[in-house]
UniProtKB/Swiss-Prot annotation:
Major subcellular location class: secreted
Stated role: V region of the variable domain of immunoglobulin heavy chains that participates in the antigen recognition. Immunoglobulins, also known as antibodies, are membrane-bound or secreted glycoproteins produced by B lymphocytes. In the recognition phase of humoral immunity, the membrane-bound immunoglobulins serve as receptors which, upon binding of a specific antigen, trigger the clonal expansion and differentiation of B lymphocytes into immunoglobulins-secreting plasma cells.
Keyword Secreted set for record: yes
Signal peptide positions on this chain: 1-19
Subunit record text: Immunoglobulins are composed of two identical heavy chains and two identical light chains; disulfide-linked.
Annotated region (Framework-3), positions in chain: 78-115
Top-rank lineage group of the source organism: Eukaryota
Residue segments, region Complementarity-determining-1: 45-53
Name of the featured protein: Immunoglobulin heavy variable 4-28
Gene Ontology biological-process annotations: immunoglobulin mediated immune response
Amino acid sequence: MKHLWFFLLLVAAPRWVLSQVQLQESGPGLVKPSDTLSLTCAVSGYSISSSNWWGWIRQPPGKGLEWIGYIYYSGSTYYNPSLKSRVTMSVDTSKNQFSLKLSSVTAVDTAVYYCAR
């Protein structure tokens, strides 16, 4: 019984902690070719300044996840080399949110976009 109780704590604790943090993406559902995609991720239940990195990923239809990049709360950024020339990320600690801009979009950029911690 001790082992079962320990196992339940081990599994349940991370879910309890993670449930306190919520990320909510917002932005247009559709963007015209050659336009700029602008997305914002609002963070609740956690101070954006308390975590090192905040990121963006995407999943094209029928494909796997693709890393876009991530940003440090101070503003330092790291981008996927294949997207670097078109990506800009920013962070707004006063609003507890961070943003993604992807310029000159084409059909290749069709995907579900996610923010992540």
